[in-house]
A protein has these predicted regions:
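HTH-adjacent hinge/linker in prokaryotic transcriptional regulators
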Residues: 1-60, 71-80, 93-97
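Conserved phosphate- and dinucleotide-binding cores of soluble alpha/beta proteins
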Residues: 2-5, 12, 87-172
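Alpha-helix/helix-capping structural signal
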Residues: 65, 86-87
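Short, hydrophobic beta-strand segments that form beta-sheet elements in well-ordered domains
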Residues: 59-61, 80-84, 166-168
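Short glycine/serine/threonine-rich phosphate/pyrophosphate-binding segments
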Residues: 66-70
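Generic beta-structure capping elements
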Residues: 20-22, 64, 102, 134-135
Length: 172
């Protein structure tokens, strides 16, 4: 997988790989566009996911529009939150939550913090729960994202979680 990824033939993701040939697999949609899609489904998913958080939890919140909607429903102020999304950190802070933002490169299109520094920073955390977005889901490839720098952050964050939840609507 690593060799094929280095050649650009596939994109490595947690649990597998995705084809690198299609246009949709090589580009991220702008966050402002993604936040307008499938609002009702994301609201149902987000409300359910937020209800899984307990006071004693140490929670990782991945960047993305589905997790952004989830934050609207988070009420647990006793939990501790870590994220790789500046917008998520700001929303949590406004709600009175204690939040940490990992370091790294800020990616303009998705507003996610990515890169080697982000991956390295995640190593010091051990989360009870993690909530993740995805660009796609496939029975063969698993969960996919078109950007290797985001995939590596997701992979490391998932490794650091006791329980992982992927928030995905039917369009994935």
């Amino acid at each position: 997988l690593t060799t094929l990824h280095q050649r650009g033939a596939l994109i490595k993701v947690h649990g597998g790989a995705a084809a690198a040939e299609s246009e949709t697999m090589t580009r991220d949609a702008d966050l402002s566009l993604r936040s307008t899609l499938n609002k009702e489904e994301k609201a149902v998913i987000g409300k359910y996911a937020a209800g899984l958080i307990r006071e004693e939890d140490f929670v990782y919140l991945d960047a993305g529009s589905s997790v952004d909607v989830m934050i609207d429903y988070i009420t647990e102020t006793g939990a501790l939150y870590v994220t790789n999304a500046v917008s998520h950190a700001q929303k949590l802070l406004k709600k009175g939550m204690r939040v940490f933002l990992i370091g790294g490169e800020l990616k303009a299109v998705t507003e996610a913090i990515v890169g080697a520094e982000a991956v390295e920073g995640l190593k010091k955390y051990h989360f009870t729960k993690g909530f993740f977005g995805t660009n796609g889901a496939d029975a063969v490839s698993g969960y996919t994202t078109p950007d290797i720098t985001e995939a590596l952050v997701k992979e490391k964050a998932m490794q650091q979680c006791r329980k992982c939840y992927v928030l995905a609507d039917a369009s994935k």
